[in-house]
Structures are given as C-alpha cells and as structure tokens.
C-alpha cells in the first residue's frame, strides 16, 4: 500500500501535474509518429508492389490450331478477327487486394514460317526476361502435335540466339528458371482460389528449402523463360474415339510424349477447350501466376483425359511411367509418328462447274451429228409387210392360197358393185354354224362330232390367222367363186 500512497503524493505534489502532462504529451507524440510511419510504409509498399507493366506473352502455333480464338477468349471478347503475320492484343490484369490494373501484351505469330522474322518486333533482349512463351497444339489433329512443338521450339531457340544476349545474363536467366522449377511446392488444401499477390515464403528450416537435383531428361533445353504448352480443341477426343478408333492407350501415349517434351523445356501442360469452356479460367490464373507472381492454389490434374493440367516443376519420369502401365500394343520408347499415324486423306469430289455452251456452236454440233446418221426409212417403207390395219401378214401364206378354189387356173376378176357380198357371206356363215350346232347336239359322243369340232377349231384358227382386211378384199374381188367355195364346205 505504501508505494501506492507515494505515487499519489507524487501526482498531487506541486510539480506532479506538470510531470503527468509532460508524460502524456510524450506518449501522444510517439503514437502520432508510429501512425505516420505506418502510413508512409504502407504507401511505399504499395508503390513498390504495383503491378509491373511491359510483360509479354508470345504465342506460337500452326494455322487453324485455335491460338487466336484462345487468347481472344482469355481477353474477354466474344469474337476475334484473324490477323496476318504478327497479331497483337492484350490481357487485362487486376489486383483485387490493392485495386491495381495493368495490361499484359500478347503477341501471336502466324503459322507460316515465312513470318518468323517479325519476332524482333515482339521480343528483344531487354524484354526477354519479362516474357512468357505459349506453344499451342491442336488436339483435333494429334498426329501433328509433336512435330509442331519441335518446330516452334526451334524457331524460338533460333530467335533467342540471334539476340546476342551476353552469356552472363543468359546464364543468370537459366539459373533463375531452374530455381523456380525446383522451388515448386504442392498447394496446401483449403487455400482460397482467388488470385492474390504472392508474399514472402516462410519456411521452418533450411533443410526444407534444399533443392532436389534435376533428372536426366529435365531442362535439357533451358530457354531461360517460362514455357507453357496449351493443347486446344480437347473436346475432339470423343471424335477421335469414334471416327479413328482411339483408345485410352492412344491418349496415354500422346500425354506421355507431351509431358516428356515439357520436362525438357521445364514447361507446364494444360488441356483446354474453347467450345466447352474447359480450363480457360485455370489457364488465365496460371498465366498471371507465372507472370505477376499471384498465388496459385490448383494442384495437378491427371484424372480426366481431356482436362489435364500439370504445372511446371511437378512432373518427373516416375510419374510419367504410371501411364506406361496401361500400354499393351506399344512401347514407351516407340516413335510418336509410328503409333499416332496420320489417317489417309479422303479426296473430296467436287462437282465441276458447267459452263453454258454457245447456242450456235451447239446447233452446229447437232447438225454434224444428224448428217452422220443414216437416213431413217418412212412409215410406208418401214413396214411393207403390214396391211392397212397395221396387223402383220403371215409369212409364207398368201391370201388366195389360204382358201381352196375350184378353179385354180382362173384369173382374178374385178368385183361387181351390184352384188351384195355382205349378205351372202353372212348367210353362208350362219348356215355353217347352224349345221355345226345341229351335229353336236344330235350325236355328242359319236366320233363324227369330234371330227366336226376339230374341223371347226381348225377353220377358226385359219380365220384368226388370216388378215381381216385381206379376206374382205378377196370376198369383194371374187364373189362368185366365194359362194361356190362356201357351199362346198357346207356339203363337206
């Protein structure tokens, strides 16, 4: 209690209030200074951590691989216009924590090697450290993937060599890239997926930061800059399975070769599909992570065959060997083009465009064709054996020979118009058929009846075979002889 009483006396003494006021003033000044220092430090930190400008993305790929469509989709535009030579666009990058914006330059090289000289306008020796390279491969044509990647990688290597970067600077870029590759760490579970600026890494001990040695086929082609292999049109995997009989073995074989290529260049691998909007957001986050250092919390994805994602530094030969366990008809060391064979080209038959022929030329051709043809006979000369009614005559059987005559030597006389031929012929026919009917009803079982029937059939056949018009002509020409012949037949 004594110390408390002494403290009270000191505070209430003649100089006590003054001492207390001075002490309070000193504490307020210290608080004000600390507040100003914190504000200044925050401002300086924000100024120092502002998103850098001048970052570049260099895109390579074949014509029709979808590289322009892919980058246009990442830009947020609905439709992009295909350029020629060297295309340019930009990606908008936003830091949500510090409300900062910047633009990332995107350069897309034409698929024709003729335009590779334009790379000097996109990337220089000064801007190379701030550049990210994207190799685009078309998965709808997997037989072209490896050849395309090798071609564009050699084009980039040739361009870097032409820059004549000092060896010390180039070795520094390569060492930094190797360190970034080795420092890859698996994202922790439960981390938020929003892109945030990367802070300083905290580690418990130096043993955890020891970099593992690189494998035999890892970073054998170190370009000194980050590389990303993007496979587009991965929605075509189902089409490959239906039309080209691709199986899981084919897809695993393709993936194994792609991952080996990525190991050689220290590249990341991602399968995308603009049509199905698959892995596009993941691609954007990984680009800003590698370019601006944003936090990235997505682990490797190898389960779905059309949505593979392998970040740089995660893969190795042992993980790739897991794919080889499913190989039955192919070996891991087999050449890519020996197993992934280009299908035969189906020739499309196009309808030829027909040009209208000149009218006069057409008529001249028709005239020449008609002149070459033999003269066609007229109707009268075409059917000389036909009668006026058009029915053919029986060959080898003349009109007069078909009817027996009592006067074979008599000549044919002209008919007399005064005689009624029709009435006489009708009377003869009526008497003839009446005699047949009377004989048939009188003795149906007698042999004579059968003979009469056969005779009637024969005469009927003769009547059918003979020409009607010829019979009429004969009857009009020889009325007398016809009446005599008819009576003779009745008596028989």
From Swiss-Prot:
| Compartments, as annotated in UniProt | Cytoplasm, Cytoskeleton
* Residue ranges of the region described as Disordered: 187-206, 371-423, 437-492
Instruction: Give the record's subunit note.
Output: Homodimer. The cytoplasmic dynein 1 complex consists of two catalytic heavy chains (HCs) and a number of non-catalytic subunits presented by intermediate chains (ICs), light intermediate chains (LICs) and light chains (LCs); the composition seems to vary in respect to the IC, LIC and LC composition. The heavy chain homodimer serves as a scaffold for the probable homodimeric assembly of the respective non-catalytic subunits. The ICs and LICs bind directly to the HC dimer and the LCs assemble on the IC dimer. Interacts with DYNC1H1; DYNC1LI1 and DYNC1LI2 bind mutually exclusive to DYNC1H.
Check the record and name the InterPro entries matching this protein: Dynein1_light_intermed_chain (IPR008467), Dynein_light_int_chain (IPR022780), P-loop_NTPase (IPR027417)
Write out the GO biological process terms. Answer: microtubule cytoskeleton organization; microtubule-based movement
What's the main place this protein lives? cytoplasm
Give the molecular function GO annotations. Answer: ATP binding; dynein heavy chain binding
Cite the record's Basic and acidic residues compositional bias ranges: 471-480
Q: Where is the composition biased (Polar residues)?
A: 371-381, 452-469, 482-492
The protein's organism comes out as: Pongo abelii
Positions where Omega-N-methylarginine occurs in the chain: 397
Q: Where does ATP bind?
A: 61-68
Q: Superkingdom of this entry's organism?
A: Eukaryota
Identification of the protein by name: Cytoplasmic dynein 1 light intermediate chain 2
Q: What does the UniProt function comment say about this protein?
A: Acts as one of several non-catalytic accessory components of the cytoplasmic dynein 1 complex that are thought to be involved in linking dynein to cargos and to adapter proteins that regulate dynein function. Cytoplasmic dynein 1 acts as a motor for the intracellular retrograde motility of vesicles and organelles along microtubules. May play a role in binding dynein to membranous organelles or chromosomes.
Q: Which residues carry this modification: Phosphoserine?
A: 194, 383, 391, 443, 446
Q: Per its UniProt record, what Pfam families does this chain match?
A: DLIC
Q: Which residues carry this modification: Phosphothreonine?
A: 441
């Amino acid at each position: 209690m004594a110390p408390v009483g002494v403290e009270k006396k000191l505070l209430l003494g003649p100089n006590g209030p003054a001492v207390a006021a001075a002490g309070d003033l000193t504490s307020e000044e210290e608080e004000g200074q600390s507040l100003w220092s914190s504000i200044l430090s925050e401002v300086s930190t924000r100024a120092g951590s502002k998103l850098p400008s001048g970052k570049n993305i260099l895109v390579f790929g074949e014509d029709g691989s979808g590289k322009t469509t892919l980058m246009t989709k990442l830009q947020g535009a609905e439709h992009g216009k295909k350029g020629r030579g060297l295309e340019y666009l930009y990606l908008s990058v936003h830091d949500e924590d510090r409300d900062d914006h910047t633009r990332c330059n995107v350069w897309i090289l034409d698929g024709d090697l003729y335009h590779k000289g334009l790379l000097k306008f996109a990337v220089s020796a000064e801007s190379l450290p701030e550049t990210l390279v994207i190799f685009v491969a078309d998965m709808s044509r997997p037989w072209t993937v490896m050849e395309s990647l090798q071609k564009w990688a050699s084009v980039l290597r040739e361009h870097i060599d032409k820059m004549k970067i000092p060896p010390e600077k180039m070795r520094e870029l390569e060492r930094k890239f190797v360190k970034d590759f080795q420092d890859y760490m698996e994202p922790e579970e439960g981390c938020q997926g929003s892109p945030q600026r990367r802070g300083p890494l905290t580690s418990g001990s130096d043993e955890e930061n020891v970099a593992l040695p690189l494998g035999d086929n890892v970073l054998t082609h170190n370009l000194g800059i980050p590389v990303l292999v993007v496979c587009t049109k991965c929605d075509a995997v189902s089409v490959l399975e239906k039309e080209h009989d691709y199986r899981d073995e084919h897809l695993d074989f393709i993936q194994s070769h792609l991952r080996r290529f990525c190991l050689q260049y220290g590249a990341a691998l991602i399968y995308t599909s603009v049509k199905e909007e698959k892995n596009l957001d993941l691609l954007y986050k990984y680009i800003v992570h590698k370019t601006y250092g944003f936090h990235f919390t997505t682990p490797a994805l190898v389960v779905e065959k059309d949505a593979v994602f392998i970040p740089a530094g995660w893969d190795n030969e042992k993980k790739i060997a897991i794919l080889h366990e499913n190989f039955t008809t192919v070996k891991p060391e087999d050449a890519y083009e020996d197993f992934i064979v280009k299908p035969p080209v189906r020739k499309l038959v196009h309808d030829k465009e027909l040009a209208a022929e000149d009218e006069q030329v057409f008529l001249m051709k028709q005239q020449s064709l008609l002149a070459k043809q033999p003269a066609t006979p007229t109707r009268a000369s075409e059917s000389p054996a036909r009668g006026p009614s058009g029915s053919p005559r029986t060959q080898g059987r003349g009109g007069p020979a078909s009817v027996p005559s009592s006067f074979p030597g008599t000549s044919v006389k002209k008919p007399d118009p005064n005689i009624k031929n029709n009435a006489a012929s009708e009377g003869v026919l009526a008497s003839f058929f009446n005699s047949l009917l009377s004989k048939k009803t009188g003795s149906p079982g007698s042999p004579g009846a059968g003979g009469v029937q056969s005779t009637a059939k024969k005469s009927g056949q003769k009547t059918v075979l003979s020409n009607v018009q010829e019979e009429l002509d004969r009857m009009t020409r020889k009325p007398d002889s016809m009446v005599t012949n008819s009576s003779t037949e009745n008596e028989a």
